[in-house]
Amino acid sequence: MPKIKTNRAAAKRFRKTASGKYKAGHANRSHILTKKATKRKRNLRQQNHVRAEDAGRLDRMLPYL
């Protein structure tokens, strides 16, 4: 049986925590930042936790992570 390919786009965007959940960085923090409030930019620095509904999809995309 052949190995399952890892989705490289997902592998670059998501990390798995010790408890088996996934986390990723927020969008909207790369450019055009002057119009965004300091509080909003500060909150975008935090990691975003993936919902349980989407975790199953990530498990299939990232079999060896």
Swiss-Prot record:
Residues 1-65 are annotated as: Disordered. It holds the Pfam family Ribosomal_L35p. Disulfide bonds: none annotated. One of its GO terms (biological process) is translation. GO terms for cellular component: cytosolic large ribosomal subunit. GO terms for molecular function: structural constituent of ribosome. Residues 10-44 have a biased composition (Basic residues). The keyword Hydrolase does not apply. Residues 50-65 have a biased composition (Basic and acidic residues). Belongs to the bacterial ribosomal protein bL35 family. HAMAP family: Ribosomal_bL35. NCBIfam families: rpmI_bact (TIGR00001). This is Large ribosomal subunit protein bL35. The gene is rpmI.
